[in-house]
């Protein structure tokens, strides 16, 4: 081992040399990490992963900015202007409230001369209990047999309960319940569109007389609204303000004694709102003017139009 004045410097203090090498490796590693972070940030920004202008995102909205409404990625099916020669077949129904929607809407559709009503509803049915009544299968059958061009559907009254799915209960309100409920609603919407409906008007739940129901109705409405936004051609029809007072509380004058169902006046009020949505799409230039015939009997006409 050399010990004279000309011995190599590295042999004088090998520990110092190792420390310098370690520092250089750390600096190099830090530079590599920094470069990779910059590249990753650029790729995410180009992919739109940052969401809105502020780049915020949320797992709850699937990477979309908080509060953003999801948009369908395809344009809605084309519609035509409804005429007497080429009328629009409108299926209306759902649960018992959907039945009342149909009762109110049918006379208005018939009187228009350009819309043809088709009605069906099932009491006590809904999205949760397809072991009792399977709306998924029923809607497939309806689209195949009735072949409506437009659908006005209303259900959710009976969905303040757990979901039954192939022998397994999913407790109401849990994350898994919300996921399954949304999936069933979305599947039904897609069934209608795939079955030939060019427009689907999914009517939300109204405010209820029993206050405990309202948070649950709002949960259902929120899920339906979100799914409607994901399906081109589906419109969510909000009727909550329609049956509330000016200060947002329950308005009993339109409702039956159970605080859920509608009076005849309430049915007509609901039908007017849904009919307005139909006309906006299918009769943008207005309806043909009615020309009464000389031998028409007003009493007979009124009686015939009021029957579903």
What residues fall within each predicted segment?
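Solvent-exposed, acidic/flexible segments
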Residues: 90, 94-102, 132, 144, ...
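N-terminal secretory targeting modules
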Residues: 1-91, 281-308
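Sec-exported extracytoplasmic/periplasmic mature domains
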Residues: 106, 110, 114, 144-147, ...
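Active-site segments of SGNH/GDSL-like serine hydrolases
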Residues: 154-160, 164, 188-220
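Active-site-proximal beta-strand/loop segments in catalytic clefts of secreted hydrolases
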Residues: 93-96, 120-123, 153-158, 197, ...
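Catalytic His-Asp segment of secreted/periplasmic serine-dependent ester chemistry enzymes
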Residues: 206-308
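Conserved SGNH/GDSL esterase-like catalytic core that processes O-acyl groups on lipids
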Residues: 80-176
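Alpha-helical scaffolding within the catalytic cores
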Residues: 75, 133-145, 182-191
